Regions:
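Electrostatic cytochrome c docking/interface patches
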Residues: 1-12
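The canonical Cys-X-X-Cys-His
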Residues: 13-21, 94, 98
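Detector for the c-type heme attachment site
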Residues: 19-25, 37-38
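Short cysteine/histidine-rich zinc-coordinating motifs and their immediately flanking basic loops
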Residues: 27-33
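Structural microenvironment flanking redox-active thiols in thiol-disulfide oxidoreductases
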Residues: 28, 40, 45-46
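A short secondary-structure junction motif
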Residues: 35, 39-42, 71-75
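Short Fe-S-cluster ligation motifs
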Residues: 44-63
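C-terminal capping alpha-helices of c-type cytochrome domains
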Residues: 58-102
Length: 102
C-alpha cells in the first residue's frame, strides 16, 4: 500500500509539539520544512546537539525511516526525546507528508 500524505499530516501533529512545518520557524526542535534532501544539523538558526552535528547525513526517506523508528539509537545523545514511531506504515505516511514540505 502506498504512503498516505493526509494520514502523515495527522500523524505529524505529534511531531508538531516540538517542530513546525513552516520555513524558518523553530520550536524546541528545528523546522521540518524542507527537511527531505537537507543535510542534518544544517539550519543556521537552530542550536543542534553535538550528537546531531556529528551525525552528518542528508535526510532522505531511508534515513528518516531509520531515525524515526528509534531516534536515540540512531543518534545517541540527540536532544529529541520522542521515542519513535514503531509502525513502519505510520513512518512512511509521515515521511510522505514531510516530502510535501518544500
Amino acid at each position: 500500500m502506498a504512503a498516505d500524505v493526509e494520514a502523515g499530516k495527522v500523524e505529524f501533529k505529534k511531531c508538531a509539539l516540538c517542530h513546525t512545518a513552516e520555513p524558518g520557524k523553530n520550536k524546541i526542535g528545528p523546522s521540518l520544512f524542507g527537511v527531505v534532501g537537507r543535510k542534518s544539523a544544517s539550519l543556521d538558526n537552530f542550536n543542534y546537539s553535538e550528537a546531531m552535528k556529528k551525525f552528518d547525513h542528508t535526510w532522505d526517506a531511508e534515513t528518516l525511516d531509520t531515525y524515526l523508528a528509534d531516534p536515540r539509537a540512531v543518534v545517541p545523545g540527540t536532544k529529541m526525546i520522542f521515542p519513535g514511531i514503531k509502525d513502519k506504515a505510520e513512518r512512511e505516511d509521515v515521511i510522505a507528508y514531510l516530502e510535501t514540505l518544500k
